[in-house]
């Protein structure tokens, strides 16, 4: 009798995705981040659900309800800090996952890549709205500044912003709808993840060599299940170290001050994982230009497959492209640092140079490097 896991309609899908899936025999730890992202998403939905049981999305009680969670709810502080720091772990894994895709040329799987970009945008929107919910100073002013960027859209901008706010400023209506969206979007993300995997399993995974691995596949279980479990344990270890020893390390102290529309904090800045984009936004002295640059800083990923000039898929054997890739990583770290600095000399100049370099590497230098490497190899 055939095994039930291969016969049952539901078990069959799980079996073909996680058990009997033919996987390349040489995928490295950089391929762990997909499953780590799934772990992060599950953790965020679970901790978020328990937080939502105690949270109230009203301007008068939101801040107090978060305080109540931390002080009075059994292990509420653990749940709250796991959720807040879980978001940081989520974005670390996200950026590593995208970086892996860039380095090894996984963007040649265009459908998977494009769904990934949509996922990235959705997760960024979810995280932004989540940051508004505790209703501290940085929550309120972050929401005000970021939503206000939409007013740069010609003609409809102002109406659009007021429509999103549900009034003439960030207020009760804004907080309530942000909570509603913050609750629903992770489930949208889950659905998109399924589509992401559907497209991935149409082609199979890429691998570090960039060469087809059809002739050398191994079953996903037990080889990669055990590898993924090890990765997940390391992820949870790092997360719990953060939660237990320095839960506020990555947060902003201003968010422990209740939101006050009458007093602006000295430095309005988003969470650390948005600082690189915030730095690009601020480096352009024109409002609409800044907003476009902010959008393009992520949307540029969509045209990466079109800019691939090399005859090799990954960068494993392409030293010039490797140098540019790590320069890009360093540049993004510099932008992240700049995003958290005040708008004054020399930070403005450094931010502008780093922003120019970011777009130059992706749009100009990497395609040129691909052509040079082809010529060196006489291809």
Curated annotation (Swiss-Prot):
Binding site for a ubiquinone: 201
Record membrane topology: Multi-pass membrane protein
Residues involved in heme b b562 binding: 83, 182
Highest taxon above the source species: Eukaryota
Free-text remark on how the cofactor is bound: Binds 2 heme b groups non-covalently.
Predominant location: mitochondrion
Annotated residues for binding of heme b b566: 97, 196
InterPro entries noted in UniProt: Cyt_b/b6_C (IPR005798), Cyt_b/b6_C_sf (IPR036150), Cyt_b/b6_N (IPR005797), Cytb/b6-like_sf (IPR027387), Cytochrome_b (IPR030689), Cytochrome_b_C_euk/bac (IPR048260), Cytochrome_b_N_euk/bac (IPR048259), Di-haem_cyt_TM (IPR016174)
The entry's keywords: Electron transport, Heme, Iron, Membrane, Metal-binding, Mitochondrion, Mitochondrion inner membrane, Respiratory chain, Transmembrane, Transmembrane helix, Transport, Ubiquinone
UniProt keyword Hydrolase, yes or no: no
PROSITE patterns in the record: CYTB_CTER (PS51003), CYTB_NTER (PS51002)
Disulfide bonds: none
SUPFAM superfamilies, per the entry: a domain/subunit of cytochrome bc1 complex (Ubiquinol-cytochrome c reductase), Transmembrane di-heme cytochromes
PANTHER family associated with the record: CYTOCHROME B (PTHR19271:SF16)
Subunit structure comment from the entry: The cytochrome bc1 complex contains 11 subunits: 3 respiratory subunits (MT-CYB, CYC1 and UQCRFS1), 2 core proteins (UQCRC1 and UQCRC2) and 6 low-molecular weight proteins (UQCRH/QCR6, UQCRB/QCR7, UQCRQ/QCR8, UQCR10/QCR9, UQCR11/QCR10 and a cleavage product of UQCRFS1). This cytochrome bc1 complex then forms a dimer.
Additional detail: Heme 1 (or BL or b562) is low-potential and absorbs at about 562 nm, and heme 2 (or BH or b566) is high-potential and absorbs at about 566 nm.
Function, as annotated: Component of the ubiquinol-cytochrome c reductase complex (complex III or cytochrome b-c1 complex) that is part of the mitochondrial respiratory chain. The b-c1 complex mediates electron transfer from ubiquinol to cytochrome c. Contributes to the generation of a proton gradient across the mitochondrial membrane that is then used for ATP synthesis.
Assigned protein family: Belongs to the cytochrome b family.
Protein name as it appears in the record: Cytochrome b
Lineage start: Eukaryota, Metazoa, Chordata, Craniata, Vertebrata
